[in-house]
Curated annotation (Swiss-Prot):
Coiled coil: none annotated. Keywords: Cell inner membrane, Cell membrane, Membrane, Transmembrane, Transmembrane helix. It is a multi-pass membrane protein. HAMAP family: UPF0761 (MF_00672). It comes from Chlorobaculum parvum (strain DSM 263 / NCIMB 8327) (Chlorobium vibrioforme subsp. thiosulfatophilum). It is found in: Cell inner membrane. One of its GO terms (cellular component) is plasma membrane. It comes from the Bacteria. This is UPF0761 membrane protein Cpar_1343. NCBIfam families: yihY_not_rbn. The keyword Cell inner membrane applies.
Length: 426
């Protein structure tokens, strides 16, 4: 009886329904993974990281040396970074990197500035790559970007140093020995995973120039940290059993080995970013396969945003871009960001001195066609299942008129167009 019930059509249908949404989500994420060229982006970042690793660590340690409390922790902080982010077979890499970093201390002022510029370029590339995943079209303003990059470059080392000091205090005061010794070993084994998850959570939460939900960034950080640990174990196994770097390159084998590891790291980081992006923008509702062609696709959303800015303006207040992105005007926050950027770029709205948005055109004289003709291509299309803004009777009448006009104009048989195109070919 139980076997019959388990294999019933209803049970099979429920099981299919449970698997349908995860399958659609993975398909959505895979499409964006391919579209964003994640593997190529990871290779580009790995190459730039390889060139910037020594300058970045040198600048970070120089910043820490400014504060006496961190001055004696150089080796501890280096060990912290290698323990959490380097593979198990990284002893040789660690030795070479420390040699390179020690040599940077003899550089002149110009050389030091050059190291800072290289480090900032790496942070800028990471910023542009992650914002590309979140489909941010407009770059950060120069001062805003510089402030963010400089904050990361200066506060990042301080946070790491503070973490090392705090963990050392807890380590030697709470887990001094005795019955807590076993707990000390257990905590030690989980620290790299926890530290990696926190670092990636902050990366996904802070860097994208979009609103990212806390739980999405946290889930992405945990997933990427787990993948990170798997990558470390696989890399250690691969190097120990299959890698031929040393046989081919000899003493230089550390360079391709380090590049390969950094490449794996960036694949994991960018995969986690795609996971977080997909959590925010995936909609499991399937589109209507028989949906009628809509010549005004995207226009109601643009007008909804313009209307929200206008209504706030005439009421005496101004909507900021941040408030718009956190509002429920459009469920698809990525498309909402594109609309705001389009309206600002084409001077339909402008930012006030207080950072609010104000309508910049005369809505009584400007026509819909003037708006429509300037809309970028990406606003005319949407991902399957993404919600649209409901519109009124005027739009329905306009759609019917456009469809009728298109139908009358496009009565030409396709063979005539094909022949005409063939005749024009050289």
């Amino acid at each position: 009886m139980s076997d019959t019930k388990k294999n019933s059509p209803v049970s099979s249908l429920l099981q299919h329904e449970r698997l349908r949404v995860p399958g659609m989500y993975l398909s959505f994420m895979a499409r964006h993974f391919v579209h964003d060229n994640i593997l190529m982006s990871a290779g580009s970042l790995a190459f730039q990281t390889l060139l910037s690793l020594v300058p970045l660590m040198a600048v970070s340690l120089s910043i820490l040396r400014v504060f006496p409390v961190f001055g004696s922790l150089k080796q501890n902080i280096g060990d912290f970074l290698f323990q959490n982010f380097a593979p198990a077979q990284g002893a040789l890499m660690k030795t070479y990197l420390w040699e390179f970093i020690d040599k940077t201390s003899s550089l002149s002022t110009v050389g030091g500035i050059f190291l800072i510029v290289i480090a900032l370029f790496l942070i800028s590339t990471i910023d542009h790559t992650l914002n590309g995943i979140w489909e941010v079209q407009a770059p950060r303003k120069v001062m805003q970007g510089f402030t963010l990059y400089w904050t990361v470059l200066t506060l990042g080392p301080l946070l790491i140093g503070t973490s090392v000091v705090a963990s050392s205090y807890v380590w030697y005061s709470v887990f001094a020995g005795g019955e807590l010794l076993q707990q000390k070993v257990t905590v030690l084994s989980y620290l790299p995973l926890i530290n990696t998850a926190i670092a990636l959570f902050l990366l996904y939460m802070v860097v994208p120039n979009r609103k990212v939900r806390f739980r999405h960034a946290l889930a992405g950080g945990v997933l990427a940290a787990l993948l990170f640990e798997l990558a470390k174990r696989w890399f250690a196994f691969y190097v120990a059993n299959f890698a031929t770097f040393e046989a081919i390159y000899g003493a230089l084998s550390v360079v391709p080995m380090l590049f390969f590891w950094i490449y794996l790291e960036w694949v994991v980081v960018l995969t986690g970013a795609e996971f977080v992006f997909s959590l925010g923008y995936f909609n499991p509702e399937e589109p209507d396969e028989q949906q009628e062609f809509d010549p005004l696709q995207g226009v109601p959303e643009v007008l909804a945003v313009l209307s929200a800015v206008w209504q706030a303006q005439i009421s005496g207040s101004f909507l900021t871009g941040k408030k718009l992105l956190t509002s429920e005007i459009i469920a698809d926050r990525s498309k909402l960001g594109l609309i705001v950027e389009f309206l600002e770029r084409n001077h339909f709205v402008h930012q006030t001195a207080d950072g609010g948005l104000a309508v910049n055109v005369d809505l009584h004289s400007m026509t819909l066609y003037e708006l429509y003709s300037q809309m970028p291509r990406e606003l005319f299309s949407s991902e399957p299942g993404r919600e649209e803004v409901a519109d009124g009777e005027i739009f329905e009448q306009m759609r019917s008129g456009i469809r009728a006009a298109l139908q009358n104009t496009m009565q030409t048989p396709l063979i005539e167009l094909v022949n005409d195109s063939t005749q024009r070919d050289p």
